[in-house]
């Protein structure tokens, strides 16, 4: 529960509209719960459901690499609202990784499907993808955290 709220708070502090903040809070529900996009659309409207859908990974049967490559390519041309929610999600994720890294060191990489090198590839390319249409405050923060974690 803490992660979705943290994503919403990042968006709120960055000045995004209520609909974007709500989508940030709901961004993982379709993938991680029984509350699906049709439920979000019914309860919160088409706009919020579309933002959440844009932040969801494709078919989980695809390899980690294929899913991440899809995300990187999709976000290059996604709407500014989808890019903001995706960026806030990754920003909170990387800050959590940094916190764990500071406590556990390189052992932290054992918790992931792919190791440090692949995570660095993903986050570095994600930053470039998110800024493809132009930089914004959350992507600048994400880039700083990526450098902080991987350029130690």
Describe the residue ranges of each PLM region.
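Active-site helical microenvironments for divalent-metal-assisted chemistry
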Residues: 1-152
């Amino acid at each position: 529960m803490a992660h979705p709220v943290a994503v919403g708070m990042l968006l709120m502090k960055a000045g995004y509209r209520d609909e974007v903040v709500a989508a940030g809070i709901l961004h993982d529900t379709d993938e991680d719960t029984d509350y699906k996009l049709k439920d979000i659309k019914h309860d919160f409207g088409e706009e919020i459901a579309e933002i959440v859908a844009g932040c969801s990974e494709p078919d989980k049967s695809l390899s980690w690499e294929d899913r991440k490559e899809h995300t990187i390519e999709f976000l290059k041309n996604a709407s500014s609202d989808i890019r903001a929610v995706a960026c806030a999600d990754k920003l909170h994720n990387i800050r959590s990784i940094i916190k764990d890294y500071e406590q556990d060191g390189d052992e932290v990489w054992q918790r992931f499907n792919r190791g440090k090198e692949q995570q660095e590839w993903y986050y570095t390319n994600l930053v470039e993808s998110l800024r493809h249409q132009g930089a914004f405050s959350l992507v600048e923060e994400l880039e700083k955290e990526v450098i902080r974690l991987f350029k130690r």
